[in-house]
Each structure stands twice: as C-alpha cells, then as structure tokens.
C-alpha cells in the first residue's frame, strides 16, 4: 500500500458526506515533499476550508502511522491537541470513530466533552452521554482548586479517570 492510497482512505473516513477531494504527495527536488488536495480531474484545490485542510494533514499522519505499523518499524503514540476545534459535530464524530479503529496508543487533549454548565466549584461539567460514545480509556485533566491566580507555584494538575 502506498502513502497516498492510505492517506486517501483516511481522508474519506474523516469527511463522510462532505467534499474531500484527493490527497497528493508531491516530491520536491530538495528531498522535501508537499501535501496538496486535488479535485477528481487532478486540478489543485487552493485554500480548502480549515476543517478539510486539518483532515488532509490528519489523513497523512494516520497513513504514516498505519504504514510504519505494517512494516513493524517503530510504533509511536499519536498525540493530538484540540484536533477537532474546526470541525462540525458530525465531522468530530467521524474523527473519533477513525481514532477508535486505530490500534495504537492515542492521546487527545480536547475540550470537546465539556459543557457550558458548571458545578459548585465553577468547573465545567463533562457531557457524559457524548463521552460514552468514545470507546477508549478516558481521563480528565484539570486544575486543582483552590489556587492563587497570581502565583504560578500554586498551580497543580489533577488527573481524574472518567
């Protein structure tokens, strides 16, 4: 399986029901490569929307991860920071479905499962119904309260299993 084929497989999964085009990896003469999006006729898609551009890069990352796993080379965890911030609710669901089917350690830092509602301490509540759809071990990272807002040394993190 080639890198482009694997990337386009993931691009399709991440963009169900939306325009997705095709990922192309263009080799440059200086041993570099450029990732572009093309239309069915092969013409380049300039300035795709933020969500499509994000899924294009994600699809390449997933493809590299898949191909290195197949070749039994180094298997590294995937780490994402706010990966779905530009996604609609449906596209966010597609992302988590794809992640759920990748058989490797994945760490995702996101606020996607926090609600506008707060508890008695003023902390955002977790949307447990939405979170229950994610088939993975889940943790919440939050600030230990109280802390002094003017003294960095008072900041501590709490990891809570969900």
Task: Label each region the model flagged.
Residues 1, 34-62, 83-89:
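Conserved ABC ATPase signature
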Residues 1-27:
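Amphipathic alpha-helical domain-onset/packing element
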Residues 22, 30, 84-87, 97:
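Eukaryotic, compositionally biased intrinsically disordered regions
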Residues 48, 68-73, 98-102, 115:
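Conserved catalytic network of the ASCE P-loop NTPase/AAA+ motor domain
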Residues 50-57, 79, 105, 120-121:
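Glycine-rich phosphate-binding loop
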Residues 61-69:
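Metal-dependent nuclease catalytic cores in nucleic-acid-processing enzymes
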Residues 74-83:
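Walker B catalytic motif
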Residues 91-162:
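C-terminal lobe/lid and adjacent interdomain/linker elements of RecA-like ASCE P-loop ATPase modules
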């Amino acid at each position: 399986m080639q890198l482009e084929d694997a990337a386009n497989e993931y691009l399709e999964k991440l963009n169900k029901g939306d325009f997705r085009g095709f990922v192309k990896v263009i080799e440059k003469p200086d041993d570099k490569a450029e990732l572009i999006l093309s239309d069915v006729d092969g013409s380049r898609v300039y300035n795709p929307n933020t969500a499509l551009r994000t899924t294009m890069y994600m699809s390449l990352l997933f493809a590299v991860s898949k191909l290195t796993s197949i070749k039994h080379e180094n298997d590294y965890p995937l780490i994402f920071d706010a990966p779905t911030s530009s996604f609609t609710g449906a596209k966010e669901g597609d992302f988590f479905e794809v992640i759920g089917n990748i058989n490797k350690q994945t760490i995702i830092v996101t606020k996607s499962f926090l609600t506008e509602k707060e508890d008695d301490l003023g902390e955002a509540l977790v949307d447990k119904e939405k979170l229950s759809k994610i088939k993975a071990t889940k943790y919440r990272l939050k600030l230990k309260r109280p802390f002094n807002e003017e003294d960095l040394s008072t900041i501590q993190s709490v990891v809570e299993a969900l």
